[in-house]
């Protein structure tokens, strides 16, 4: 999870880069913030996928076997 204000800082640096450019320190900060954001996004996405179940219109579980296996590993079963 990103700390409060990090997303705003990412957006601020992106806008500044477009309008006036960034110093080397700001470019490094932007890169680090983007990496943290991607890590948090991927972790959140994986958590959502590991809780997902696919059901057809008849109510049958049609979750792909690969996903079921990954879910079992994720839960430690």
Curated annotation (Swiss-Prot):
Localisation per UniProt entry: Cytoplasm
Pfam families: DUF896
Annotated family: Belongs to the UPF0291 family.
Predominant cellular place of this UniProt entry's protein: cytoplasm
Gene3D superfamilies: Helix hairpin bin (1.10.287.540)
Keyword annotations: Cytoplasm
Region entry Disordered, spans: 53-77
Biased composition (Basic and acidic residues): 63-77
Protein name: UPF0291 protein EAT1b_0405
A GO CC annotation given for this chain: cytoplasm
């Amino acid at each position: 999870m990103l700390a409060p204000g990090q997303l705003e800082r990412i957006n601020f640096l992106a806008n500044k880069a477009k309008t006036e450019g960034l110093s080397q320190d700001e470019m490094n900060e932007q890169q680090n913030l983007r990496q943290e954001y991607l890590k948090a996004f991927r972790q959140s996405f994986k958590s959502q996928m590991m809780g997902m179940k696919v059901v057809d219109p008849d109510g049958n579980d049609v979750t792909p076997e690969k996903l079921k296996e990954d879910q079992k590993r994720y839960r430690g079963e």
